[in-house]
Each structure stands twice: as structure tokens, then as C-alpha cells.
Amino acid sequence: MDTAALSPSPSPASGAEHARVLTLACTNRKGIVHAVTGALLGVEADITESQQYDSPDTGDFFMRVEFVTPATREDIDQALAPVREEFGMRMGLWDAAQRMRTLVMCSKDGHTLNDLLFQQRAGTLPIEIPVVVSNHLDLQPLASFYGVPFIHVPVSKDPSSRDSKEAAEARLRDLIAQFDIELVVLARYMQILSDELCRDLAGMAINIHHSFLPSFKGARPYHQAHERGVKLIGATAHYVTADLDEGPIIAQSVQPVTHAQTAADFVARGRDVEGSTLAQAVRWHAQHRVLADGRRTVVFS
């Protein structure tokens, strides 16, 4: 998501061409694109991709620019500062080659975790997964197969237990800090996060819901869909918020089904959709293609 100030990223040696990603959002008015591209021209930037959107609902303007330049990060920041001030922009600047450090949380169902770990290894997702966290031990062998550390953080329903939800979330916060995490992915993690943790992770936590939201929220959505005789099932990747399954949607996919298929068939087909949908959302987020527009998102896919 875009940030109020330019986000930190390493500065390359002066003179070396380096790829950067710039995102911005502000109230729409004339002259924004001209001002931004002019500032980039001042640091010898060669723009390789540029996308923009003017929201008719909020009146905000959104822009994402990829460019290469020999300028240092400090030079770019200095060139953009007057533009940011003039238009009151929320702006982010990143190293395009830097992989996003991602903590994956899971429970017992490993298909989405496996997809993320495989794509990380294959180089098709611009993320680095330094740790997998789970409230169960079932998926430890899967993480070990990919050489990724697995940390068991059990969650007890007893608030007085050493494994209480409060204690588990405190442990999660420690791990986020320890591993310098930029993104948290709930890959079928079957625990509801506290409102406080959801607020703290706003814009940096993605969940996959095994339903085409806003239909069939909560548990066993495929069985709900089967009972209603739907002809399409799907999956929704969204940002985590305190309102369960109500966060801004990043990506959705659907799969056709028929009356002849059982609820178990729905589940099997749905798993494939979940994996691809979550991976797409993670990819877009890690490439800084997702910006908040009220309760919605702008996705420069």
C-alpha cells in the first residue's frame, strides 16, 4: 500500500542504472502527471511503465510508475519532495528488484502454503519467505522440504493458558520484528486475529477466503454454495481488517460447477482457485500495484 512518506529502500551506487517503483495518491487536480514526470526527468529517469486512475467515487488520483535511473535514492527523494508537498501526496518509493519479506501463517491445510513456497523457489513470486508460522504441527514437513524455518505457535481457547490467543499474537509480533517482515499472508490460517492486531497489520496482511465474497462468508462456504446450487464457485484474496472477511478485495477468481458435483468436488476445485488467487494477490502487493481507495483497492495489474 502507499505510504505517507517515501518508503525506505537501499541506495545503489551513483551512476549505475537502477529500477525503481513509485506509487502515489492524492486529491485529483490538474498538473499531477506533468509535475511527477518532470521531477523524474530531473534525475535522468527513463520511465518504463506508467499507470494512473482517477476515482470518480472519492475524487482521488492514483499513479504507479516504474523507471530506471542512475540517481541515488536520496536524489530521487529530493527531486520529488516539492511535488509531494504541493499536491499533498501519499507516496512510496521502492527498489523494483528487492523481494518482499513475507511471513506465511497456516493451520492444517497446506495447498496454498505449498503454492507460495513453490513459486518463491521458482522465482515467479517477488517475495522472500524467511519463516512459516502455524498453530499446528501438521505442515512442518512441508516447510522443511523447502528449507524454510517453521515455528509452532499454538493457540488455546483458555485465556489463562500460556498459549492463549493474546500470548500467541504477542509471539507473532515478536517474529514480525525479528524477521523484518513486510507482508503477512494468512494461507488458510484458521484463527481469527484480534481487532488490535488487524489494525496494526492494516495494509500489510492478506487473507485468502475460500468463497467469492461477499457471498458465503464464514465457515464451510463450499458446502453453503453446494446447498444453494450455485453454478460458479470462487476465491477472494483481501486485506485483513477487524471486520471478518470484509477487507478491501485485491483479487478474485471463479470456477464453473454443475448440479452433478458433490460438496467434496466443490472443495477440490476450489483449492486450485484459492492457490492461484492468493498468489496473484501476493504478487500484485509485492510489486506495489495495489493502492487503497476507501474500502476498495486500485490494482494496477
What are these regions (language model features)?
Residues 3-14:
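Intrinsically disordered, low-complexity terminal tails and inter-domain linkers enriched
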Residues 5, 53-301:
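One-carbon transfer enzymes
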Residues 13-27:
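Short glycine-/aliphatic-rich beta-strand segments at the starts of folded cytosolic domains
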Residues 15-19, 36-37, 42, 86-89, ...:
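FNR-like FAD-binding dehydrogenase module
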Residues 24-35, 70-71, 106:
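Short, surface-exposed ligand-recognition loops at beta-strand->loop->(often short) alpha-helix junctions
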Residues 29-49, 80:
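Short amphipathic alpha-helix segments
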